[in-house]
Amino acid sequence: EMTHRAKENLEASLDYPKQLKIIAHSQPDSAFGVTYFTRNEITGMLKVMAVVTKQLMVKTKDISDISNSDAYTVGLMRRQMNAATEVQNMIFKNVPKGQWSGWKVKIDYECVDKDGLKYRAERWVFFDKDGKNVIKTFEIPLP
C-alpha cells in the first residue's frame, strides 16, 4: 500500500512517468523525523554519492572544464549538488533520533529527464503515521 503510494508520488514528479522503471524498493520502515537517517543509511548514501562524484570529476577534468559537458553530465551535476546540500545538512546538524513520526520507503529507479536523457536515482518518501500522506521526499542520483 505505502510502496504503491510512494510510486504514485514518484510518477507525479517525473517529466515522463511512462518511462519509469523501478529497479528496487524497500518495505516501509519506521521514520523518526524526516531528516533522521540511520548511520547505515547515511553511509550508503555517501558511498553512492562518492561514485557519482568520481564519475563527474572524470567527465569534467576535475570540474576544470565544464564548458563542453553534455546535457547528461550537466543534469547529473545538478542532481548531485542538490543531494549533497541535503546530505551535508543532515550530517552537520546531526539530528538526533526523534519520536516515531511515520514511515519511509526507498525506491531506486530509472527514468528519462526533460531533455530525454536516461538517469537513475534513489528516492526516499516519508509518510505520516497513517501511511497515507507524503510528508517529504529526498533524492540522490545513482551511478
For every predicted segment, state its role.
Residues 1-143:
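Cystatin/cathelin-like cysteine-protease inhibitor module
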